Amino acid sequence: MKNNILFNKENLFIVFLFFFSLLINQYYGNKGIFPVDSFSHFDTGFRILLGEYPFKDYWVVSGPFVDYLQAIFFYLFGVNWQSYVLHASFLNVVLSITTFIVLRNFNLNIYYSFVYSSLFSILA
């Protein structure tokens, strides 16, 4: 019997991690905000949409990559809280799946890799 690549354990775990890390971040991202930290990239992403440049027109606290990525999400989905949380959820998905793949490349057991990546997605 052929081993179906689509339905092997590793791919199923990656699909589950995708949905789990996306949905948990969407749920808790809409629970509330912490005003000191929550709007740091919101404002800079919006300013990039207005045509301003980081470091030239305003000071950036964490580097321009996240701000430009946030501007892309604002451009595609509109300037609102949902697109802001979707951006955070997208990064959570990328980091969680990357964690799983790196742990698997270190030859860690697939179940341990999945559990650690799931826990990482809750924290990230």
Residue spans for each PLM region:
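Start-transfer (signal-anchor) and selected internal transmembrane alpha helices
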Residues: 1-24
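Membrane-interface starts of transmembrane alpha-helices
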Residues: 9, 79-87, 109-113
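Extracytoplasmic catalytic/substrate-binding loops of multi-pass membrane glycan-assembly enzymes
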Residues: 29-44, 57-69, 79-82
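Luminal/periplasmic active-site loops of membrane-embedded glycosylation enzymes
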Residues: 44-54
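Membrane-embedded glycan-lipid processing machinery
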Residues: 58, 62, 73, 83-90, ...
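Aromatic- and kink-enriched transmembrane "portal" helix at the membrane-lumen/periplasm boundary
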Residues: 81, 95, 117-124
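Transmembrane-helix motifs of polytopic, lipid-linked glycan transferases
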Residues: 86-108, 115
